[in-house]
């Protein structure tokens, strides 16, 4: 059977519309979890204020130079802030991926589904999803730091891995290997969707500061919710595509 991107886009749009409220609630809940965890593990406002003390920002030629000019205490605060942001984001993304994929599975099985039921049902696979998303994010970031293009290629090749991990109950590394093979053989169907996702995420990041006009916390929840909705659309597309390829 010939698979066209247009037919998968249409199926994705129909599913997203039919399950919009459930997906929205999952996205909102994951955004709230991300923001709360980030706030809990981040340094205090007083500690963050110390980052500006005695650091010659204007005289620094780059990020590494700026960090080197910091005191050991300031470097520790920066590391804690970065780790808190990364950890909370990974937790939120793992719950989102598990919740959305379980929504698709439950709906496909003809069962009634709610946001809490989907997230609860995904609990057993969340540890593996967390490790998978951590490794994927690490590889993509390393690739982007090198020449950008390798990072984008890794993002494309590993995009279906969460779907394969949950749907076929694979291990972390097995799902990564299978994802690379499947994507390489179907690059024309996977690459445009992932590139569109990356573009949408980038545009959202550019306008994220405007959400802070409300309050920083509410703005962060709204921005994360929109980001999660974008990721949910990609997950639905990849799940549908994977099911068609397997037939």
Swiss-Prot record:
Keywords for this protein: Cell inner membrane, Cell membrane, Membrane, Transmembrane, Transmembrane helix
Bilayer disposition of the protein: Multi-pass membrane protein
Instruction: Indicate where this protein resides in the cell.
Output: Cell inner membrane
Question: In the record, which residues are listed under signal peptide?
Answer: none
Coarse class of the protein's main subcellular location: membrane
By its UniProt entry, which InterPro entries does this protein fall under? UPF0259
Report one GO cellular component.
Answer: plasma membrane
Q: Which residues cross the membrane?
A: 20-40, 87-107, 118-140, 152-172, 187-209, 225-245
- Tell me which stretches of the chain form a coiled coil: none
Q: Which family does it belong to?
A: Belongs to the UPF0259 family.
**Protein's name according to its UniProt entry:** UPF0259 membrane protein YciC
